[in-house]
Amino acid sequence: MLKVRRNLITITLAMVGIMMSTSHAKPDLTTPVDMSMLHAKDTGYRFVHHTFMAPAPQIPYSGKPDLQTKTAQSYAKPRHYQVWLGIPEQPFAHKPANHASLPNKIIYMLDGNAAIDDLDKDRLYALSHSSPQNAAPILVFIGYQTPYRFDVDARAYDYTPPLLLTETGSKNAFQEDGRDRLNGGAEHFYSLIENEIKPWVYQQLGTKPKQEAIWGHSYGGLFVLYTLFKHPEAYEQYFSADPSLWWQDGEMTRYWRAYQDMPESHPSEQSKITQLRLTFSQSPKQTTTPVTVEADVATPLSKQAFAEEVCTHFKGSCRYQFFDQSHGELFKTSLLESLDSL
């Protein structure tokens, strides 16, 4: 009888463990985000809100009938964004004549709804009351017009890069492997940030901060790396959290190889110092090196190999760390760490 009870306890604990790991692995897509913190007093920040829109992705004929299906077309919708700008109140309340104490650091956070959801009043207050020598950062949350943490279809397009051109490749939208949703809109999303979101931010601030940073997780981490490899001048600091290196059989490895071939990628040729922070979970899916079927492309790298190669290239300007956490858990951990390191 005792043995039976022990077996039942073991089975129950195992089932609980599975349920917990599953809950951490899958993002919450059903619980509305509480935005009340943005209107609360005593956070040390004043928030300004604005909306943006991007046109529907174009799906040109590519010889692949599946791209012309009604299912694919149903994902080709305009994207609607909500952007919250958090301005520290304390430095702006004094405004010295030489502007020495005005905030000169700003961070753009992807998946802005979820990022807001993972912060609280105490964290914002602590950020806003940095020392005069280390002014409080300006916060930009780039989210979607949804009551939930994520718009999974919109981010799947916005955050994923176009495929590097090959004989059969294209820089246009394409369907994600094994799914109907669209990928490949990172360059369009980059242009939206540079040409619409950033100018609006500068207008609200009345100045352009000297040090700009960007943070993203998962597909957002891919976008951070894409921006670094294609537009390294866009930011001074890049925070890529558990980037989906497995995506498209390691397409980001190909971008990394192409970046290395650019003369301006070498530290001696860079006009400014670029800092990169990589954080990784112990997710089995991304720990295993993916296998590619093309013989003429670079072999995709594991997370460890990718981090070592990239940080060797950037020398003292790059750091990486593995956390004993799930992919989902690392979202908040990496976000808070990035904010604390500004």
Language-model segments: which ranges?
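A domain-start/cap signature at the N-terminus of enzymes
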Residues: A25-K105
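C-terminal catalytic histidine-bearing segment of alpha/beta-hydrolase fold enzymes
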Residues: T279-L342
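Active-site nucleophile loop of the alpha/beta-hydrolase fold
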Residues: Y144, F239-W247, S283
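Gly/Ala-rich beta-loop-alpha elbow adjacent to hydrolase catalytic centers
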Residues: G216-G220, V224
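Residue in the alpha/beta-hydrolase core beta-strand immediately N-terminal to the catalytic nucleophile
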Residues: A213, Q237-F239
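Active-site machinery of serine-nucleophile hydrolases
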Residues: N113-L182, A186-Y190
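Conserved hydrolase catalytic core segment
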Residues: Y226-E236
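Alpha/beta-hydrolase fold nucleophile elbow
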Residues: G206-H217
